[in-house]
Amino acid sequence: MQKLELLYEGKAKRIYRTESADMVWVEYKDSATAFNGEKKETITGKGRLNNEITTLLFRKLQEVGIKTHFVEKLSETEQLVKKVSIIPLEVVTRNVIAGSLSKRLGMEEGTVLAEPIVEFYFKDDDLGDPLVTEDHIRVLNVASPEQVSVLRDMALQINQVLIDHFASCRVRLVDFKLEFGVTEEGEIILADEISPDTCRLWDETSNEKFDKDVFRRDLGNLTEAYEEILKRLGGISHV
């Protein structure tokens, strides 16, 4: 498989065409951004870490029957994935009060929820990726009610798998963001990535943060935090 011309470049990844009409080549970048791109920095090794962690987690999900776009890891920073039409919704699942939810509800960060909350955010940088209801989604016409139901069900299924998997590594899955795509056959599958960029991950005992909040809140060394997650997941750490 050959990497051809650049199709798209986002904050954290570059997407390239391949000679296969139904595959694209993903390259993870060393860039870190927060607050819708207002805070930016290049962090050497971050792309490798996100690629390695995403590979491990997508393989885990595939093992239990959850369909994803992941095909294979090509290098430390690259992977081959199925080409899909991305649904312009971020699906956020929350197990513990943190971040914007703490501010919105006036609840203390770290409060464990009795059951997960699933939220939808409309993917639009100009609008700041606003929180939307199912009624808003219908007005925006970005997903059908049936598709929204599938997204919710898949998010909750993935949540349970990841909660258990991270717990075995002594990590608490606080919340995380997923993106989904539609194949040419009309099937909804998991896309994008699952990494400390898209999850809040806390040590189960100390609540030490191993995610992008380290960068957002200037809490320490981002690379060391991501390396710790990779090490606990059984990957090869470069520390």
Swiss-Prot record:
Record carries keyword Ligase: yes
CDD domains noted in UniProt: SAICAR_synt_PurC (cd01415)
Protein name, UniProt field: Phosphoribosylaminoimidazole-succinocarboxamide synthase
Pfam families xrefs: SAICAR_synt
Catalysed reactions, as listed in the record: 5-amino-1-(5-phospho-D-ribosyl)imidazole-4-carboxylate + L-aspartate + ATP = (2S)-2-[5-amino-1-(5-phospho-beta-D-ribosyl)imidazole-4-carboxamido]succinate + ADP + phosphate + 2 H(+)
A GO BP annotation: 'de novo' IMP biosynthetic process
GO MF assignments: ATP binding; phosphoribosylaminoimidazolesuccinocarboxamide synthase activity
InterPro entries referenced in this protein's UniProt entry, alphabetically: SAICAR_synt/ADE2_N, SAICAR_synt_PurC, SAICAR_synth, SAICAR_synthetase, SAICAR_synthetase_CS
HAMAP family: SAICAR_synth
SUPFAM superfamilies for the chain: SAICAR synthase-like
Keywords, in A-Z order: ATP-binding, Ligase, Nucleotide-binding, Purine biosynthesis
Family listed: Belongs to the SAICAR synthetase family.
Family annotation (PANTHER family): MULTIFUNCTIONAL PROTEIN ADE2, SI:DKEY-6E2.2
Gene: purC
EC code: 6.3.2.6
Lineage: Bacteria, Bacillati, Bacillota, Bacilli, Bacillales
Organism name: Bacillus cereus (strain G9842)
Claim: Disulfide bond is one of the keywords in the record: no
Major enzyme class: ligase
Pathway participation: Purine metabolism; IMP biosynthesis via de novo pathway; 5-amino-1-(5-phospho-D-ribosyl)imidazole-4-carboxamide from 5-amino-1-(5-phospho-D-ribosyl)imidazole-4-carboxylate: step 1/2
